[in-house]
Amino acid sequence: KLRSEARSGAQPSHEEWIEDEGCRRTYYAVYIFFGLLTLTFNHTPAISFNEFDSLELPSSESLWNLEASDEESWRESLTASTIITFREAHDTLFQGDSARYSAFATRVMINALFLEVWYHKRSPEALQDVVTEYKLRLALETWEKSLEICEPETVVVQLSAPHKGHPLIFNAMAMYRNTRARLLVDLKTVQEALRYHDSYEVAASMTNARDKVKRSQEMIKVIQECFECIEVAALQGIRWVARTSATNWSIEHPLCGMDLMVILTLWLYRLEHDEEPATEEELAMYNKLRNLFDDDSVDVYGAKLSSIVARLWGSMIDEVVVWG
């Protein structure tokens, strides 16, 4: 940042830009790592949102890996690229306007939105603060729309890969689903119990958390995110994913998926045990989830879909190659 300011608006040379961009990427990578620590352990983020402010977001991988033949062609490539600052992207998302940035920047911005949701849910005024909740929901919806205009990347995707586009966007989607869910359902008590590996505490906290998973129109949208999370594994093959994902998937997926599977299990349990009959939308979602699993899974775990989801997800995490 200081080097950029010292240039007084002049474009950097290729060598100068590489040095600056390397620093930015390292800084943002640490920011994402701290975001995952907050997700996992509910630690207060070590890097403040305000530290980025006027810092440019990471460039596209194409520009980062570009081997320019001369300074002139390099400057042309830099001028043609869309690089905005963290603050510009943040403000644009909260205004409901789509923002164009790189795949790496996409991952950075969903990390920022996740942390804003985390702070909001820890605020004493969270229950009454419907304005902030509306703004966060708008920003998340705009972030998802912005994927359509993300900086194009030339990336080779293996046929066996669970995603069709850039792997960073695949990882960002895991964080997005979790953030959408956390905005509606706060499972802090369950998360705390899971940290200490006491099965009785976990069972008690999940029983008490049932009422937090409402049967509402808004909850159906969250359950859709849960469906998309487990669908990735189901379409690839539950057992195959369980045995290979720890070595070739990013850690975001099991960490973010854990909350979603707890919410999904509690929602299914309520649907199966509540006296209130299921609505048409709830039944449609229930059947959509049921169709993801083969008959063998149902035979092993019984007819209750909540049991199937809980046991299958647990068996995936507790496979031969486990997540560290």
Can you describe what each PLM-predicted range is?
Residues 7, 54, 64, 133, ...:
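Alpha-helical interaction segments
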Residues 10-13, 78-80, 291-324:
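Intrinsically disordered, low-complexity regulatory regions with latent secondary structure
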